[in-house]
From Swiss-Prot:
Domain of life: Eukaryota
Coiled coil listed as a keyword: no
Gene Ontology CC terms: nucleus; Shu complex; site of double-strand break
Record gene name: SHU2
Primary localisation category: nucleus
Main function: Plays a role in a RAD51/RAD54-dependent homologous recombination repair (HRR) pathway to repair MMS-induced lesions during S-phase. Required for error-free repair of spontaneous and induced DNA lesions to protect the genome from mutation.
UniProt family annotation: Belongs to the SHU2 family.
Protein's name in the database: Suppressor of hydroxyurea sensitivity protein 2
Subcellular location: Nucleus
GO biological process: DNA recombinase assembly; error-free postreplication DNA repair; maintenance of rDNA; positive regulation of single-strand break repair via homologous recombination; recombinational repair
Quaternary structure and partners: Component of the SHU complex composed of at least CSM2, PSY3, SHU1 and SHU2.
This protein's UniProt keywords: DNA damage, DNA recombination, DNA repair, Nucleus
Length: 223
């Protein structure tokens, strides 16, 4: 990537005040506000502070007595920030829909997908604007195969483990507050993750160690 390209994940990482880790940095927050349309950033921060965001983990190993919550945070750190997870972590990112009777919203930052109406709306708009001769892949995904153009940015990145190419979803075409909120949480820094999950305790990390309960979680999402 060009040196002029903004690395959003590094900006997200600076959201927590360096002098007081119990507060957000107002300067960085104000800067990010103007970088996203439709007040996306404000809505994402509101989501992170709403107590409506959940990370469910199929917990086969880290169900330790006495310190379960801390160990689950360590699992997320290993998976998203240290890359030291020994096995593929099975997790689901869920947002409680504020509309009565509506199913939970499923968010997948790894594949840049959300089941909310906002995501579907802008995805279909991008689809309608696509020329018949254009591939949808080319319209929505930025592919980088020149190592000199590689970026350290992790925001909207697809398949980050590839060594030969980089792929980024064009979030300026399709994005929602749910994807942005979970990206801020999981594609920024350990400090930001712990700020919302431990310090403020607004995002809940929940272990599921029963496969039947894990399957029921998916059924509830579909319903």
């Amino acid at each position: 990537m060009s040196k002029d390209v903004i690395e959003y994940s590094k900006l997200f990482a600076k959201l927590v005040n360096t002098n007081d880790d119990t507060k957000l940095d107002d300067t960085i927050a104000s800067f990010l506000y103007y970088m996203f349309p439709r007040e996306l950033f404000i809505r994402a921060i509101s989501l992170l502070e709403s107590s409506d965001m959940f990370i469910y983990i199929l917990d086969r190993v880290h169900n330790k007595e006495g310190n379960e919550h801390t160990s689950l945070i360590d699992v997320l750190v290993d998976e998203f920030y240290k890359g030291s997870s020994n096995s593929l972590l099975e997790y689901r990112l869920i947002v409680k829909d504020t509309n009565d009777g509506a199913p939970p919203i499923l968010v997948d930052i790894a594949h840049w997908f959300c089941s909310c109406e906002e995501f579907c709306k802008y995805f279909h708009e991008a689809l309608e604007k696509t020329d018949e001769k254009e591939e949808l892949h080319d319209v929505l995904i930025n592919e980088v195969d020149d190592h000199l153009q590689f970026s350290d940015d992790r925001f909207a990145q697809l398949d980050p483990h590839s060594l030969s190419k980089q792929w980024y979803f064009k979030f300026d075409k399709v994005c929602c507050s749910h994807l942005l909120a979970f990206s801020i949480l999981l594609r920024s820094s350990i400090n930001v993750l712990k700020f919302f999950t431990v310090n403020s305790n607004k995002v809940f990390v929940i272990a599921i160690d029963n496969i039947d309960e894990w399957l029921n979680l998916h059924i509830n999402i579909v319903e």
